[in-house]
From Swiss-Prot:
GO biological process: cellular response to misfolded protein; DNA repair; proteasome-mediated ubiquitin-dependent protein catabolic process; protein monoubiquitination; protein polyubiquitination; protein quality control for misfolded or incompletely synthesized proteins
Name of the coding gene: ube2wb
Name under which the protein is recorded: Probable ubiquitin-conjugating enzyme E2 W-B
Catalytic-site annotation from UniProt: C91 (glycyl thioester intermediate)
Compartments in which it is found: Nucleus
Keywords: ATP-binding, DNA damage, DNA repair, Nucleotide-binding, Nucleus, Transferase, Ubl conjugation pathway
Length: 151
């Protein structure tokens, strides 16, 4: 537990002092707990999400960084994207099977920025309705199938 807290403190400071472009730590979210963070995000200029505001929820287990964080969009504005379900779940391999303890909150944020920035057309995944009705609340419990950068 102590190593997890030490690692999270280090990552928290890094996110506060040198956040990825368009991202800021929601300071209120970490006042009472180190294991759940909200990161505010603004869509990058020149993208289909330019100027839009989103929130990412990070939840860390006691096994972090050996276990990936649970990451999902939350709040009133979930991005419409082929890899983002309307309940906020994100189909991104580094959040599950491609996770490595060498990755960090910063690297997850950069991957999500990249994923959104490369989108040319706002649309939901084809199985959105079925998935949202039948999925587990924890996106890490989903068995994702990754095919050529699509889910």
């Amino acid at each position: 537990m102590a190593s997890m807290q030490k690692r999270l403190q280090k990552e928290l400071l890094a996110l506060q002092n040198d956040p990825p472009p368009g991202m800021t730590l929601n300071e209120k979210s970490v006042q009472n707990t180190i294991t759940q963070w909200i990161v505010d995000m603004e869509g990058a200029s020149g993208t289909v999400y330019e100027g839009e505001k989103f929130q990412l929820l990070f939840k860390f287990s006691s096994r972090y960084p050996f276990d990936s964080p649970q990451v999902m969009f939350t709040g009133d504005n979930i991005p419409v994207h082929p890899h983002v379900y309307s309940n906020g779940h994100i189909c991104l391999s580094i959040l599950t099977e491609d996770w490595s303890p060498a990755l960090s909150v910063q690297s997850v944020c950069l991957s999500i920025i990249s994923m959104l920035s490369s989108c040319k057309e706002k649309r939901r995944p084809p199985d959105n309705s079925f998935y949202v009705r039948t999925c587990n609340k924890n996106p890490k419990k989903t068995k994702w199938w990754y095919h050529d950068d699509t889910c």
